[in-house]
C-alpha cells in the first residue's frame, strides 16, 4: 500500500521536547492510500487520530509539500514476520515515530522524526 510520511513543526504551544528536536522535524504523520482514498493517521495528541483526507487519485504529496511539510513517499510492508521480543518493547517509544514505524512495518532504530526521515531516505 502506498504511504506518505510527512514531517513538520508543531503549531501553537509547541512540543515539550521541541528544543531537542531538529527544526521542521518536530512531528510526523502518515497517510495511506486505500482503494477508496487517502487516510491520514496523526498521533499528535497521544491518541491516534484517523481521518479520510481525499480521493485516491488526489496528489496528497504535493498538498503536504505546499503546506510546508517535508515528505517521503514509501510503501507499507506487508510481508513482515511478527516476532515478540520483550527487549524491543522496553526500548520502543510511544510517539509519532513509533506509530509510523508500526504502520509501515519497519524495525530499524529511530526515536525522533529526523532519525526516521534519514532511515526512510536510505
Question: Residue locations for each model-derived region?
Answer:
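Cysteine-nucleophile amide-bond enzymes
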Residues: 1-122
Amino acid at each position: 500500500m502506498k504511504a506518505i510520511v510527512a514531517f513538520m513543526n508543531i503549531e501553537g504551544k509547541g512540543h515539550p521536547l521541541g528544543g531537542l528536536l531538529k527544526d521542521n522535524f518536530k512531528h510526523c504523520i502518515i497517510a495511506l492510500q486505500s482503494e477508496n482514498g487517502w487516510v491520514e493517521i496523526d498521533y499528535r495528541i497521544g491518541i491516534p487520530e484517523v481521518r479520510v483526507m481525499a480521493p485516491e487519485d488526489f496528489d496528497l504529496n504535493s498538498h503536504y509539500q505546499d503546506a510546508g511539510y517535508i515528505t517521503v513517499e514509501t510503501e507499507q510492508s506487508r510481508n513482515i514476520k511478527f516476532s515478540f521480543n520483550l527487549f524491543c518493547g522496553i526500548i520502543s517509544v510511544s510517539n509519532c515515530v513509533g506509530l509510523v514505524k508500526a504502520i509501515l512495518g519497519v524495525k530499524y532504530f529511530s526515536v525522533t522524526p529526523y532519525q526516521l526521515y534519514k532511515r526512510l531516505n536510505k
